[in-house]
Amino acid sequence: MATNIVGKVKWYNSTKNFGFIEQDNGGKDVFVHKSAIDAAGLHSLEEGQEVIFDIEEKQGKAYAVNLRVK
């Protein structure tokens, strides 16, 4: 698991409860689900919002977890 990755919210759809975070290090965009947002105590994410997160691999896909606002 990669930790303390810095990035910006590329987009988040609050109706569909998911979005993507663009990594500042140029890595692939990372999927973020509402469950990670809820676990962080946040209500939603805004496009361009700076965040710090960990990446967890599940079934070959990367997910943002342990989300924090920068």
From Swiss-Prot:
Q: Does the keyword DNA-binding apply?
A: yes
The primary location reported for this protein is cytoplasm
**PROSITE patterns with a match to the protein in the record:** CSD_1, CSD_2
Any single GO CC term annotated in Swiss-Prot or TrEMBL for this entry: cytosol
Q: Which GO terms describe its molecular function?
A: DNA binding
Q: Does the keyword Nucleotide-binding apply?
A: no
Q: Which residues form a coiled coil?
A: none
Localization recorded for this chain is:
Cytoplasm
Keywords of the record, alphabetical order, are:
Activator, Cytoplasm, DNA-binding, Transcription, Transcription regulation
Recorded hits in Gene3D superfamilies, A to Z, give: Nucleic acid-binding proteins
Name all CSD domain ranges: 7-67
Recorded hits in Pfam families, A to Z, give: CSD
- InterPro entries named in the record: Cold_shock_CspA, Cold_shock_domain, CSD, CSD_CS, CSP_DNA-bd, NA-bd_OB-fold
User: By what name is this protein known?
Assistant: Cold shock-like protein CspA
Gene name? cspA
